[in-house]
């Protein structure tokens, strides 16, 4: 059905970026020809292989106009291609429309990834270029493996986008701060000793760290160098006797310097990390995660050293939250729940009465979060998606491009989170604004059934996220539905909202769900041109029961408490067990959140958490 022009703004102004993007690609090709480069790769990386980037490193966004958080562009003499996953297909099609860039949908059978594309389309004597300061060693190794049967040269010293990007933003210069032990639960010295214990098990003399969240975790420092991700750009190096932090020292105040030194951490300039690595004695064993170390730093490791590769030691340690962190997380989710309920009440009272758009709704939600003590910033850009915009999983409303006005009809998906001193939050609710279709109600209820099926599961110790993923998809599969993304991801503690190594996904993962791991559960239904539905809660893995015949079993303990919109639930599709779960959950929502609300908000919440049968 066509949208009435006087009711809604157009979703995307197609073609706005076209000429600019094509001009940039043309300029890039000229540079490539000058440097003897046949194909040039522009990934979504910074020197630390971060998922979310500071503006300075958004080279792929600059060259393509595609603003999603994941994707790779390859430019050759006669083609420009963008690869991205199912979360962004709709968004990517809109944002590159009219330009010469082609979209290759990652994960679709028969669609080559960019490694396969380069292997199949380049010939002997050709060359591949990339910026080795941002390209991870693991990707270089994979590229070498794919191209090994051809005489193709790798040229890794040129940041060609940097040469073209004349108004490139400066590198971030935010101040670092110390995360108090009352939040972290352990001092930096204690964490460094835990790292050394793991180094001993791996026979490692040194542990080289490039990933910002791991560095922030082990040294108990945080910063504002990346929007929504409280990290500070730096490198780390830990030996059996010493620990170093390489950082722009202007970012450190006296308190932070003193804390680091008290905890056995030496400080030096950011640019000197490679000098330190080059001086490591021959015969020493250096542990690295090749997916989190860039090619330039990898090349600084002396030839006489043995390189031990694996997942960062800190990745596994920080994934299992300690009791202090978990208790703080519970406090953060109460605060977040209060903000969400106040927002939902405000929305209910004002949609159709005052002008509310996707953008202004997201701003209002942030306003409610900022009222909570200890709130620092959002944990990611709020996804406030009305009607068919919600079919784009990581949609972002923007003034002048896409910004629907909310009406008293349809579904409104809000996926948001906050950074608090007590932890990082993430929550999604799909809200009924007025009349909805039977199809929308059915899809919402099927999503809810999948959510309940997984969140209430008991599972044997040793289970991985890929083992339990099917539980959330099963009700959808029975109706011929699925979602082209994972079901859940780990969440950091005042760190990245996406954290590994665990996840819940169809993609095989051998990481066991351990007690203390925090993870999201967020099944959904996404129908292009119609609607998007997602229900997300955050849980912590906990012990359940131990039996003579089964052994040790685990469960999910819920952290987030926000009402699930009953107006979208078809009770006839729910089992008695599912109804009981929903009633019990809503009872907890009311009991935990209502003490922090006004009288009118409490009355509203009581109705929204009423028992169903």
Which sequence ranges carry the predicted segments?
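AAA+ ATPase active-site-proximal loops
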Residues: 1
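Active-site neighborhoods and metal-handling regions in enzymes and metal-associated proteins
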Residues: 4-613
